Amino acid sequence: MKLMKLFGCAALACMMTGCISFSRERTEITITEPSGEMIATTCVRAPGKIVVDGKMDEAWKAVPAVTHFHCPPNYEEPISKTEGRIAWDDNYLYVLLVAQDLDLMAYTDFHDGPTYKDDVLEFFFAPGPGPKTLEYINFEINAMGTVYDAYHPDRTKGLNGEEACKWECEGLKSAVTRKGTLNEPLDKDEGWTLEIAVPWKAIPWMKGRQCPADGEEWSFHFARYDYSKYLPEGKEELSSSAPLPKVFFHDVDHFAPLYFKK
């Protein structure tokens, strides 16, 4: 496991520093006048007990859905639809992501591996308005359930994949369910669901605090890589819930506002 962990970290470090070129998130295609609308999301208190099992239970149905996904940089509507929900209680920050997917694909099976090469759902968040925030966290979990977690303490120093990869979200709960057959291109699938619970005590900037205050502002976005033979020319589709002006999911300046509500 240690060897695989080191391999994952080394590979990620190379991707982020440019010594290899297969990380598509390094492609910074920009448009002159971004037209995406910045939509704020309210993180409500969980209306009931949330069991992390990768399913849309009754508690989740009462949480507002985030449906405004688009494909950067031109803000096109994704072919593969995604829906996200976010809630909290005294112990955890919860996320549920439901993805339509006709061709489920994932091969990365070791922790902190290159899950972006697979069908993957991602959650990025930072402790304040994006332009004023240095640190952030991202989770990238593939359709197999493999977890990549990273903490970036100071984004002004660049993307240090090796250091970010060393952080582990202690006590993280995650679950994936699929409607379809993984890695079977001859059939047509329906999609998959990811559910995670991030302990407040595991978040570096929450030391000494139990949970965010009522009305506190953070920033975030949900993101996705979808690889499918059913997409035009069989290419991948990248989408986000934030108006990113370039194909770069780590663009903290353009994370969307997230307000906590009791």
Regions found by a protein language model. Give the residues of each.
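Low-complexity intrinsically disordered segments
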Residues: 1, 14, 24-27
